[in-house]
Curated annotation (Swiss-Prot):
This is Na(+)/H(+) antiporter subunit F. One of its GO terms (cellular component) is plasma membrane. It holds the Pfam family MrpF_PhaF. Keywords: Antiport, Cell membrane, Hydrogen ion transport, Ion transport, Membrane, Sodium, Sodium transport, Transmembrane, Transmembrane helix, Transport. It is found in: Cell membrane. The chain crosses the membrane at residues 5-27, 34-53, 63-82. It comes from Alkalihalophilus pseudofirmus (strain ATCC BAA-2126 / JCM 17055 / OF4) (Bacillus pseudofirmus). InterPro entries: MrpF/PhaF-like (IPR007208). GO terms for molecular function: sodium:proton antiporter activity. It is a multi-pass membrane protein.
Length: 91
């Protein structure tokens, strides 16, 4: 029973990932694309978490940590780019 619920959750999350990916590609503004990309990262972390529960393993926990760190740094860098036009200040 629990396995079938997890499979349904994976299908719903796959649809959510697809919608976030499409929104990232065709977002009307840069801010919409950043939010969609951040949401994509969060959904991907949840998707991997459900796979970990389905396989009853902790083997992907490092992958989840790396994706979360990259998503955080990426959203901060893109937000700074929108605000100032540059990511790194040189002076």
């Amino acid at each position: 029973m629990f396995q079938s619920i997890l499979m349904i959750v994976l299908v719903v999350m796959s649809i959510s990932l697809f919608v976030c990916f499409i929104r990232t590609l065709i977002g009307p503004t840069m801010s919409d694309r950043i939010v969609a990309l951040d949401t994509f990262g969060i959904n991907l972390i949840g998707f991997i978490g459900v796979i970990m529960m389905l396989q009853e393993t902790l083997a992907y926990s490092e992958v989840v940590l790396v994706i979360s760190i990259l998503a955080f740094i990426g959203s901060i860098a893109l937000s700074k780019f929108i605000e100032r036009g540059v990511v790194f200040d040189r002076g």
